[in-house]
Amino acid sequence: GMNLVFVGAEVAPWSKTGGLGDVLA
């Protein structure tokens, strides 16, 4: 729910490096 929104916002910069972004994907 809302938690995913906040987590996604904090992971935004990491997704560029293919780090936690892969986990969310």
Swiss-Prot record:
Catalytic activity: an NDP-alpha-D-glucose + [(1->4)-alpha-D-glucosyl](n) = [(1->4)-alpha-D-glucosyl](n+1) + a ribonucleoside 5'-diphosphate + H(+)
Keywords of this entry: Amyloplast, Chloroplast, Glycosyltransferase, Plastid, Starch biosynthesis, Transferase
InterPro entries xrefs: Starch_synth_cat_dom (IPR013534)
Residues engaged in binding ADP-alpha-D-glucose: K16
Keyword Transferase (UniProt): yes
Main location (coarse class): plastid
Function: Required for the synthesis of amylose in endosperm.
Any one GO CC term of the record: chloroplast
Record bears the keyword Plastid: yes
Location relative to the cell: Plastid, Chloroplast; Plastid, Amyloplast
Molecular function GO terms recorded: alpha-1,4-glucan glucosyltransferase (NDP-glucose donor) activity
Pathway: Glycan biosynthesis; starch biosynthesis
Name this polypeptide is given: Granule-bound starch synthase 1, chloroplastic/amyloplastic
Tissue: Expressed in endosperm.
One GO BP annotation of this record: starch biosynthetic process
EC number: 2.4.1.242
Assigned protein family: Belongs to the glycosyltransferase 1 family. Bacterial/plant glycogen synthase subfamily.
